[in-house]
């Protein structure tokens, strides 16, 4: 009688156990089992606030929108509600981008001066002049302070400067080409996902916070959604399209504004019924 080493028996048992587990896994994987998955905070916020992350179908991006704050748009004497696109939802946080360009401002006041987002005049204008003109004190309190990461220009290596903490800011090249936010992932090409209208009803150039090819230039998006890396910093013909993070739990300060799509279509919300009965004639 040939003796079998104990190690062989253990190894054989191990191989048998592994084989049995593989067979069980194959059997289980052939069925679609109902599994209870707890909702994430993002999913809960989407259902509780009625807002969703951007969706892309057949190359067309659709964003949910809200009204929040008021600013001069169609004229310089009357403020109108600001419409924002929802770029992302995470719990009670909504990352918002203005649906259209809201103003024309230079990135910096001194031409050909080395500048970054941290030191530019537009950052000050957004967080002082615009913030105070567009939002009430309660609305300002609902806007979250955001740690803004200022990366170098990946194409040219231009210095992006130090990170900042802002309530209102501009998108970066990386954010304006982030498909999770509904944008075309290729920055240097035409894209309807990046087209923004001016208040006069024409598509315009809008500024980003990222540096351009040189330290005295800034990145921007043109009227057909193409990304540029050499905008003049003191030019006052480029538009401002603000971004911010809103605390959605301040629900009395904002309201749903329907949906917009990159193909130009607009889906307005259904008006809420009034409690006042219609007159009978």
Please state what every model-predicted region is.
Residues 22-30:
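Hydrophobic core
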Residues 5, 23-24, 38, 144, ...:
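Residues marking helix boundaries in flexible regions
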Residues 1-13:
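N-terminal secretory signal peptides that target proteins for export/translocation
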Residues 32-43:
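Signal peptide processing junction and immediate N-terminal pro/mature segment
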Residues 44-281:
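Collagenous Gly-X-Y triple-helix signature in extracellular proteins
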Residues 15-23:
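Sec-dependent signal peptide recognition
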């Amino acid at each position: 009688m040939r003796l079998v080493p104990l190690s062989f028996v253990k190894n054989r048992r191990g191989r048998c156990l592994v084989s049995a587990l593989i067979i069980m896994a194959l059997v289980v994987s052939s069925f679609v089992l109902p599994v209870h998955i707890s909702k994430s905070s993002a999913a809960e916020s989407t259902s509780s606030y009625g807002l969703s992350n951007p969706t892309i179908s057949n190359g067309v991006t659709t964003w949910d929108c809200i009204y929040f704050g008021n600013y001069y748009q169609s004229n310089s004497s009357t403020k109108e509600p600001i419409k924002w696109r929802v770029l992302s939802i995470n719990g009670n946080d909504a990352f918002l981008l203005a649906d259209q360009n809201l103003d024309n401002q230079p990135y910096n006041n001194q031409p050909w001066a080395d500048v970054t987002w941290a030191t530019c005049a537009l950052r000050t204008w957004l967080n002082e002049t615009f913030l105070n003109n567009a939002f009430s004190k309660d609305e300002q309190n609902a806007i979250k302070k955001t740690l803004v990461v200022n990366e170098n220009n990946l194409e040219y290596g231009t210095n992006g400067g130090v990170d900042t903490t802002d309530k209102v800011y501009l998108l970066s090249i990386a954010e304006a080409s982030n498909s999770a936010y509904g944008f075309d992932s290729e920055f240097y090409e035409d894209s309807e996902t990046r087209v923004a209208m001016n208040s006069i009803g024409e598509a315009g150039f809008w500024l980003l916070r990222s540096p351009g090819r040189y330290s005295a230039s800034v990145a921007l998006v043109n009227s057909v959604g193409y990304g540029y890396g050499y905008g003049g910093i003191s030019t006052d013909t480029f538009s401002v399209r603000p971004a911010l993070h809103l605390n959605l739990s301040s629900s009395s300060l904002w309201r749903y504004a329907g949906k917009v799509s990159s193909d130009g279509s607009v889906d307005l919300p259904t008006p809420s019924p009034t409690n006042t009965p219609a007159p009978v004639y």
